[in-house]
Amino acid sequence: MKMTNNTVLITGGSAGIGLELAKRLLELGNEVIICGRSEARLAEAKQQLPNIHTKQCDVADRSQREALYEWALKEYPNLNVLVNNAGIQKEIDFKKGTEELFVDGDEIELNFQAPVHLSALFTPHLMKQPEAAIVQVTSGLAFNPLAVYPVYCATKAALHSFSLTLRHQLRDTSVEVIEMAPPMVDTGLNQKSRDKQGLTYRGISSEEYVQYFLDGLKEGKQEITNERVEGLRDATRADYDRLFEQMNTQEN
């Protein structure tokens, strides 16, 4: 993926990794559009980054995804990079049945269905561009799950698998498929549960990870993690079992 002169759409771009990525891509000479559910957060992002374009959209809603696609192609016909960043993370205890499954959002719809659907919508357009990319934001937990976040981890594992197959299908086109698999990053993602689990401020900053991601792009990497995640991704079966037990021994 080239580093400049792109037109980039970032879902969930009003905070955290999405906003930091938008900031850095603007600095590199790209045109950047962010979308998010909150008009207030989008306005704050616009105030912070006056050159950014914003669009209110809840990508957990299928009809809004389709409307976003139509709007984006009409307003930005040269759009050549899609970043599927929007996501939520929930602590769910299945001993409680369905009590927590759909409260505060549907992880499967937002974390997996939305990026799959958006990828399908935009791919025909992206294939017409001389250079294009789809960036999927997964997680280090795609490689070894934290049991307190069971559905989140499963959606990220599914999105990792989807990224592999989509990359294979598009291998002879102009569209690169790039996976961002960050470690724990100190954003507002699921702050209440992180506080409860003692995970607050134990991650790296958005600035640090986005710099790592951009460095990976320069090197031509298609799957960009960091040293923390590489240990999970590259684990042997024995290591995997040990890491799973280690990661989940302090589960509440």
From Swiss-Prot:
Cited PROSITE patterns: ADH_SHORT
Major localization class: cytoplasm
Single GO MF descriptor: oxidoreductase activity
Catalytic center residues: Y152 (proton acceptor)
Keywords: Cytoplasm, NAD, Oxidoreductase
Broadest EC class assigned to this enzyme: oxidoreductase
Positions that bind NADP(+): 9-33
Domain of life: Bacteria
E.C. numbers: 1.-.-.-
One Gene Ontology cellular component annotation held by this UniProt entry: membrane
Protein family per UniProt: Belongs to the short-chain dehydrogenases/reductases (SDR) family.
Name this protein carries in UniProt: Uncharacterized oxidoreductase DltE
Gene: dltE
